[in-house]
């Protein structure tokens, strides 16, 4: 069956968008709240009608992720900001493989995310309460699966508990996109042998996104 590179590119952009958020938060303590909302909201949509539905049915919501994906695919440097983004992206992919191999962890993840629905009746998605709950799911279910993702940034910024929670919540969103990517036929070999196809798709989607 032919791969749907449009959907695969969307999910990859979702992973890269999470990596971008982690980098921004770790270095500055801040990020674009609209971008963060798209990523965190993707965690809650476990039965989407389509890949794009995971991200609010709007390609524009993944603009940052698509730009980040192009940066990763077009760089050969192993230093600096681009290397950080690549490391976060590939670390998320590696962690998802460990998650997929453990049915108990997958079940627990689904259960914990389901429990958030009650809290969301009373709190906004970007509230400290919900962000902390998402971070706790990452710590309890994902970070126990293997070597922890080493987040690099400003030591002062990373001491802030609210920043830590947002970073972990963004990493959980990255895992969500990685699960989706695998479900729709994504695989590591594509990142080596199908780069031109992924770059073409990402550029075509970005061309449809209005400039702000």
UniProtKB/Swiss-Prot annotation:
Compartments in which it is found: Cytoplasm; Cell inner membrane
SUPFAM superfamilies in UniProt: YcfC-like
Topology in the lipid bilayer: Peripheral membrane protein
Keywords: Cell inner membrane, Cell membrane, Coiled coil, Cytoplasm, Membrane
Entries under InterPro entries matching the protein: HflD, HflD-like_sf
Gene3D superfamilies: HflD-like
GO cellular component term of the entry, any: cytoplasm
Coiled coil: 92-128
Family to which this protein belongs: Belongs to the HflD family.
Protein name: High frequency lysogenization protein HflD homolog
């Amino acid at each position: 069956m032919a791969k749907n590179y449009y959907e695969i590119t969307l999910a990859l952009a979702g992973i890269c968008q999470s990596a971008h958020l982690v980098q921004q938060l770790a270095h500055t303590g801040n990020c674009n709240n609209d971008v963060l909302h798209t990523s965190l909201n993707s965690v809650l949509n476990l039965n989407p009608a389509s890949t794009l539905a995971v991200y609010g049915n709007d390609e524009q919501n993944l603009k940052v992720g698509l730009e980040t994906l192009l940066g990763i695919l077009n760089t050969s440097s192993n230093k600096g900001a681009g290397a950080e983004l690549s490391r976060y992206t590939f670390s998320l992919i590696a962690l998802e493989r460990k998650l997929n191999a453990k049915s108990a962890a997958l079940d627990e993840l689904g259960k914990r995310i389901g429990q958030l629905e009650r809290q969301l009746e009373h709190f906004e998605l970007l509230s400290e309460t919900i962000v902390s709950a998402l971070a706790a799911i990452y710590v309890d279910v994902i970070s126990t699966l293997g070597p922890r993702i080493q987040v690099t940034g400003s030591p002062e910024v990373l001491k802030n508990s609210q920043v830590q929670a947002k970073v972990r919540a963004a990493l959980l969103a990255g895992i969500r996109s990685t699960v989706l990517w695998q479900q729709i036929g994504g695989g590591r070999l594509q990142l080596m042998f199908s780069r031109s196809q992924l770059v073409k798709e990402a550029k075509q989607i970005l061309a449809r996104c209005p400039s702000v």
